[in-house]
Amino acid sequence: PQTETKASVGFKAGVK
C-alpha cells in the first residue's frame, strides 16, 4: 500500500 501504517513501519524496524 502507498500509506504504510505505524504497524508496518514498526514491523520493518523490528525486522532490521
Curated annotation (Swiss-Prot):
Heterohexadecamer of 8 large chains and 8 small chains. The basic functional RuBisCO is composed of a large chain homodimer in a 'head-to-tail' conformation. In form I RuBisCO this homodimer is arranged in a barrel-like tetramer with the small subunits forming a tetrameric 'cap' on each end of the 'barrel'. It is found in: Plastid, Chloroplast. One of its GO terms (cellular component) is chloroplast. The keyword Thylakoid does not apply. This is Ribulose bisphosphate carboxylase large chain. The modification N-acetylproline is found at residue 1. Its EC number is 4.1.1.39. GO terms for biological process: photorespiration; reductive pentose-phosphate cycle. Belongs to the RuBisCO large chain family. Type I subfamily. The keyword Plastid applies. The modification N6,N6,N6-trimethyllysine is found at residue 12. One of its GO terms (molecular function) is monooxygenase activity. Keywords: Acetylation, Calvin cycle, Carbon dioxide fixation, Chloroplast, Lyase, Methylation, Monooxygenase, Oxidoreductase, Photorespiration, Photosynthesis, Plastid. The gene is rbcL.
